[in-house]
């Protein structure tokens, strides 16, 4: 907390969006439409390539069966994320889905962006899914506020090297980056890379506060603690 951050890197689930939205809305929506989507789009090159990857994961198994098994394990694998993302894209485009963010999020993000503070996302969800979620909120589209959307192609979120790589790609010293997440192991990895961290502790998500890092109940509290603008 000794260096004023120039870049805020944000997690999504449990940080700016309720975990329940992903697990109780997005996942069931995709699950119910997997079979129909694969049947309708399986011949498209992108989807055919994803199905081939699934066959390598579970040789000979029906692709929908493999997708469902991966969803049951909350597996972070490319073919599943791609197909989920395509299904969600259709849902958002049709108006069947609207993302849910915590009410403090949009005003604070707009205040930060308006002050010149740089913003980026780092989530286990695909870049495409991140853009969908932030592009279809009750507060309007928020994607233009962010310079970059990082996913696990940068590496695992519990690997310090991932955070160092993000700082390099954004051309900012790690000490000038602030990472916000609800997950202590992710904060530990970022801190190891020399990045400032703050744990977002949302009561709705049942987050357990860590004794090792600064904590905040929402983004407005982060703004106060790290001397950044708030919307007040």
From Swiss-Prot:
Its EC number is 3.1.3.77. Its cofactor is Mg(2+). Pfam families: Hydrolase. InterPro entries: Enolase-ppase_E1, HAD-like_sf, HAD-SF_hydro_IA, HAD_sf. It is an enzyme of class 3 (hydrolase). GO terms for biological process: L-methionine salvage from methylthioadenosine. Keywords: Amino-acid biosynthesis, Hydrolase, Magnesium, Metal-binding, Methionine biosynthesis. Signal peptide: none annotated. GO terms for molecular function: 2,3-diketo-5-methylthiopentyl-1-phosphate enolase activity; 2-hydroxy-3-keto-5-methylthiopentenyl-1-phosphate phosphatase activity; acireductone synthase activity; magnesium ion binding. The keyword Thylakoid does not apply. Pathway: Amino-acid biosynthesis; L-methionine biosynthesis via salvage pathway; L-methionine from S-methyl-5-thio-alpha-D-ribose 1-phosphate: step 3/6; Amino-acid biosynthesis; L-methionine biosynthesis via salvage pathway; L-methionine from S-methyl-5-thio-alpha-D-ribose 1-phosphate: step 4/6. Binds 1 Mg(2+) ion per subunit. It catalyses: 5-methylsulfanyl-2,3-dioxopentyl phosphate + H2O = 1,2-dihydroxy-5-(methylsulfanyl)pent-1-en-3-one + phosphate. The keyword Calcium does not apply. Bifunctional enzyme that catalyzes the enolization of 2,3-diketo-5-methylthiopentyl-1-phosphate (DK-MTP-1-P) into the intermediate 2-hydroxy-3-keto-5-methylthiopentenyl-1-phosphate (HK-MTPenyl-1-P), which is then dephosphorylated to form the acireductone 1,2-dihydroxy-3-keto-5-methylthiopentene (DHK-MTPene). Monomer. Belongs to the HAD-like hydrolase superfamily. MasA/MtnC family. HAMAP family: Salvage_MtnC (MF_01681). NCBIfam families: enolase-ppase, HAD-SF-IA-v1. This is Enolase-phosphatase E1. It comes from Acidiphilium cryptum (strain JF-5).
């Amino acid at each position: 907390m000794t260096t004023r951050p120039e870049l805020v890197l944000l997690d999504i689930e449990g940080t700016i969006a309720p975990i329940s939205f992903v697990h109780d809305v997005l996942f069931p929506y995709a699950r119910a439409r997997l079979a129909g989507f694969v049947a309708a789009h399986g011949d498209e090159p992108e989807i055919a390539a994803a199905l081939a990857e699934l066959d390598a994961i579970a040789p000979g198994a029906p692709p929908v069966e493999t997708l469902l098994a991966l969803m049951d394990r909350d597996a972070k694998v490319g073919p599943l994320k791609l197909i989920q993302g395509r299904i969600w894209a259709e849902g958002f485009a049709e108006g069947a889905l609207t993302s849910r963010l915590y009410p403090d999020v949009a005003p604070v993000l707009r205040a930060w962006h308006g002050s010149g503070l740089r913003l980026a996302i780092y989530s286990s969800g695909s870049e495409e899914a991140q853009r969908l979620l932030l592009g279809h909120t009750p507060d309007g589209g928020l994607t233009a506020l962010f310079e970059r959307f990082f996913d696990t192609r940068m590496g695992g979120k519990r690997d310090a090297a991932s955070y160092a790589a993000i700082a390099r790609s954004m051309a900012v010293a790690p000490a000038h980056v602030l990472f916000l997440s609800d997950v202590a192991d992710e904060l530990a990895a970022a801190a190891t890379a020399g990045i400032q961290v703050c744990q977002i502790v949302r009561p709705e998500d049942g987050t357990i506060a860590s004794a090792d890092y600064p904590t905040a109940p929402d983004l407005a509290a982060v703004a106060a603690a790290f001397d950044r603008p708030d919307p007040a």
